[in-house]
C-alpha cells in the first residue's frame, strides 16, 4: 500500500493545533506541527456588541500549519466546535466574523422559539438536546438582532465547512457537524423544512 500523508486541524475553544499524520503501509505516526491560541474578539455596533471567533486570524494559523507540513499532503480534515457558522452573501463573501456560541444574544430564545414551534415536535424531528447555543436558536437571534445583516445572507456554512471553503472554494454541509444545529431531520438525514421555516431561513 502506498504511503499517505494527512493533516488534521483541530480548533478548540481556547487553542488550536495542526497535526501531521503519516501512514507507511503498516502503521500511522502522528506529529503536532503547529499550535496557536484561539481567543474570541468583540465586534461593537451602534447599540449592541457580539462576541465572535477571530476567523481570519484562525484561517491564517491553519495556513501556517499547512505550510509547515510541506508540499506532499494528500488530504486534510478540519474539526471545530459545533453549532457556530458563517454567513455568506450572494457573491460568496463572508459577511462578518462568525459569532461565538458563548455570546449572550441567544438568552431567552428557547422561550421565544417555543411560541413558533412546539418543543415536542422539534425534538421528534431532530432528536437534539435543547440548548440555546444551538444553531436554530442562534439563527432566530441573528434574525432579530442583526436583521439587516441577516437579510444579506445567501448561505450558512458551519465552521469546519467554512474553513474548507476558504481553502478550496467548495461549499458543503458535512453531516456530523450539521447534526449539532437542531435543524436536521434525524430520520431523513436532511434539512427539516418545518424547522428552517420556523427559523426564518426557508
Annotate each PLM feature.
Residues 42-46, 108-112, 183-185:
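Short, charged, surface-exposed secondary-structure boundary motifs
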Residues 1-96, 124, 152:
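N-terminal glycine/serine-rich phosphate-binding loop of ATP-dependent small-molecule kinases
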Residues 56-57, 115-131:
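A polyampholytic, Gly/Pro-enriched intrinsically disordered region
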Residues 11-13, 123-202:
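Gly/Ser/Thr-rich active-site cleft segment
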Residues 99:
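Surface "functional belts" at beta-alpha junctions
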Residues 103:
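Carbohydrate-associated surface elements
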Residues 55-58, 62, 106, 135, ...:
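Conserved donor sugar-nucleotide recognition element shared by glycan-biosynthetic enzymes
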